[in-house]
Each structure stands twice: as C-alpha cells, then as structure tokens.
Swiss-Prot record:
Gene3D superfamilies: 30s Ribosomal Protein S19, Chain A. InterPro entries: Ribosomal_uS19 (IPR002222), Ribosomal_uS19_bac-type (IPR005732), Ribosomal_uS19_CS (IPR020934), Ribosomal_uS19_SF (IPR023575). The lineage of its organism: Bacteria, Bacillati, Bacillota, Bacillota incertae sedis, Caldicellulosiruptorales. GO terms for biological process: ribosomal small subunit assembly; translation. The gene is rpsS. This is Small ribosomal subunit protein uS19. NCBIfam families: rpsS_bact (TIGR01050). SUPFAM superfamilies: Ribosomal protein S19 (SSF54570). It comes from Caldicellulosiruptor bescii (strain ATCC BAA-1888 / DSM 6725 / KCTC 15123 / Z-1320) (Anaerocellum thermophilum).
Length: 94
C-alpha cells in the first residue's frame, strides 16, 4: 500500500539535511546512505547517492524521472546468476 497523501513522502531527515547543505554550497559529492525506504525528492536531482544493497553501496545518479520512487528500487539486493547448466556429469547420470 502507498503512503497517505496527507502525510506526504518520507525521506530520512539526515539524508535530506545533507542534500540541502550540498545544494546551498553547490557541491556534488557522493552521499552514502542505508535508507533504501527514502522517497526521491526534486531537491535530489543531479546528485549521486550510494545506496546500500546489503553488501556494498551502489552509486545511483538521480534524474528527473526517478522523482517519487524509492532509493531502494535502483539498488537491487539479489543478483541472479542463472539456472543450473548441463554438465558432462549430469548428462552421464541419465
């Protein structure tokens, strides 16, 4: 379920404070965050945010189309290696 409109979008206060400070100083540094649940706001456009995927921080460059989505949507937590392949041993067992 989505968040109630009267509450507004959620963004981690620490992350928002860092973004506002960087916008005032005209800086463009990579910001590390563990807050995958934060909604991408218009103030974040143009910044690179390193989102934690459970193993490492994945750099995500924020564009206009991403506004309204969550940071976690752009840092996948699972890597699919593919299904098992036929080997010489498995075909010999048949």
């Amino acid at each position: 379920m989505g968040r109630s409109l009267k509450k507004g979008p959620y963004c981690d206060p620490k992350l928002l404070k860092k973004i506002e400070k960087m916008n005032q100083n005209n800086e463009k540094k990579v910001i590390k965050t563990w807050s995958r649940r934060s909604t991408i706001l218009p103030q974040m456009v143009g910044h690179t945010i390193a989102v934690y995927d459970g193993r490492k921080h994945v750099p995500v460059y924020i564009t206009e189309e991403m506004v309204g989505h969550k940071l976690g949507e752009f840092a996948p937590t699972r890597t699919f290696k593919g299904h098992g392949h036929h080997t010489e041993r498995s075909t010999a067992l048949k």
